[in-house]
Swiss-Prot record:
Binds to 23S rRNA. One of the proteins that surrounds the polypeptide exit tunnel on the outside of the ribosome. GO terms for biological process: translation. The gene is rpl23. Keywords: Ribonucleoprotein, Ribosomal protein, RNA-binding, rRNA-binding. This is Large ribosomal subunit protein uL23. PROSITE patterns: RIBOSOMAL_L23 (PS00050). GO terms for cellular component: ribonucleoprotein complex; ribosome. InterPro entries: Nucleotide-bd_a/b_plait_sf, Ribosomal_uL23, Ribosomal_uL23-like, Ribosomal_uL23/eL15/eS24_sf, Ribosomal_uL23_CS. It holds the Pfam family Ribosomal_L23. It comes from Aeropyrum pernix (strain ATCC 700893 / DSM 11879 / JCM 9820 / NBRC 100138 / K1). GO terms for molecular function: rRNA binding; structural constituent of ribosome. Disulfide bonds: none annotated. Belongs to the universal ribosomal protein uL23 family. HAMAP family: Ribosomal_uL23_A, Ribosomal_uL23_B. Part of the 50S ribosomal subunit. Contacts protein L29.
C-alpha cells in the first residue's frame, strides 16, 4: 500500500490535542486495511519523522484510528502545525 493511500486525514479533538501536547502523539484516521507497519512507514515517509510506536483501534462507527507516538527528537506539535491541525 502506498504511503499516501494509508492516511485518510488527521483527527482533531480535545483529547487528541492534549495527547499531541503531552504525549508527543498524532492521531489519524487511516484505511481499515492498513497495518501498524503501513501506518508507521507512511508517517515516516510523508512527514520525515521517526515513529516510536503505533496504536490502532476500530471505532464503533467503523473507521480506524491510529495513535502515532513520535520519537523524542521530533515534536508532534510541529508536524500538526504543518498539517494545519493546530
Amino acid at each position: 500500500m502506498k504511503p499516501e493511500e494509508v492516511i485518510i486525514r488527521v483527527y482533531v479533538t480535545e483529547k487528541t490535542t492534549r495527547m499531541l501536547e503531552e504525549e508527543n502523539t498524532l492521531t489519524f484516521i487511516v484505511r481499515r486495511e492498513a497495518t501498524k507497519n503501513d501506518v508507521k512507514r507512511a508517517v515516516e515517509q510523508l512527514f520525515g519523522v521517526k515513529v516510536e510506536k503505533v496504536r490502532t483501534l476500530i471505532t464503533p462507527r467503523g473507521y480506524k484510528k491510529a495513535y502515532v507516538k513520535l520519537a523524542p527528537e521530533y515534536k508532534a506539535l510541529d508536524v500538526a502545525t504543518k498539517l494545519g491541525a493546530v
